[in-house]
């Protein structure tokens, strides 16, 4: 029987005799427990909502195709980049970061930019954002960021005080905060923004030579943003504005595209780099490490079912393929465990069997035979009766030494090193970013900052003004004026930076 026959059954195939009237004792009597269809419907309904993502809960996604447009085989042996013109299927999910599933799309917030490439050597997940940097550089602060931007435990409301108290306790956050308070803090929609891998990653070629890389994805639709006032009007009329724009564009054949670029740094250049090249709060200047074109991806197919493909999409930085690798970036290293662990909690240990997460280029039957059982193991015959241990005398499931990675550079004693003794250059790059803005754009940064700090205590405002001033005096003066604070009343030249370790208000 097909869906087109229009005949209703229960979940196990039994025909449903009446969809509108419950089984009762008499026409007005109580319900009977033997109304199995009613019980089945309600029990399923009670359980159909899965945990939302702790961050990036509100998202939109689409399928597409990545095409190589430039030869980078000198840097990587990854098969998806093996020849110009080669195409790889992919899935993309964009998101806001702070809000819940029902949050408005046009909020001032970072956007998640997560890509899943179905390569012939397995899935490659690049889990990035629409900004090239982040608020901090040590992953021990991840949980506190979540707390600061989410709801207050007492009021259950999002708190600008908590947000800014956290940000201003970290002088290295100013770079990301400056981007967030700039015009690019509210993209008009998902099609008109850039994406970044943000972290430093690495590539290695067939000779075992490693280079450090950063990934960039430049929208081919152009950059378009919203002011605070425009965003408020959008939210008032359509809380799903970005999701609607992406879905409708693809549905109408207006397929969005992004060009992929990399920046490349050799190991020798990294050793001599002015700053820590693995610091997520800093960028590599394009003049020193120019963008190298790699390819282009196009999103050209909407999911048939949002829950099936977007809500159940699972991304993890640990999903990587031969020719691509990690770096000493502490923030990247700190993400390697929790992403997969969160998916196992949210979707189950066998979430890799969900269609959107399946490694299409490899084949389910060829996947790890030693990971078995678990809830909802529904594909691949649970690896059948073959050996589920190694070594075994059947000569199957041997290692593949030809895919060994080149040695990963690491040295030093295990210790909780003070990051601030290693690098306290917090303000150079946000200062340069500020000076790149037009006079009108600078004024909008001041206004946006004042709007975002509404309700924040004066000590926190002063702390932020001090950081802005150290990046550029005009930056500090402009923010102070917008906040209505006399800048001459602030100690602007204090030698001790105000970190969470040493607040001087």
From Swiss-Prot:
Keywords: Heme, Hydrogen peroxide, Iron, Metal-binding, Oxidoreductase, Peroxidase. Its cofactor is heme. Pfam families: Catalase, Catalase-rel. GO terms for molecular function: catalase activity; heme binding; metal ion binding. GO terms for biological process: hydrogen peroxide catabolic process; response to hydrogen peroxide. It catalyses: 2 H2O2 = O2 + 2 H2O. Transmembrane segments: none annotated. The active site is at residues 56, 129. PROSITE patterns: CATALASE_1, CATALASE_2, CATALASE_3. Its EC number is 1.11.1.6. Residues 1-25 are annotated as: Disordered. The keyword Heme applies. Heme binds at residue 339. CDD domains: catalase_clade_3. It comes from the Bacteria. Homodimer. Belongs to the catalase family. Decomposes hydrogen peroxide into water and oxygen; serves to protect cells from the toxic effects of hydrogen peroxide. This is Catalase. The gene is katA.
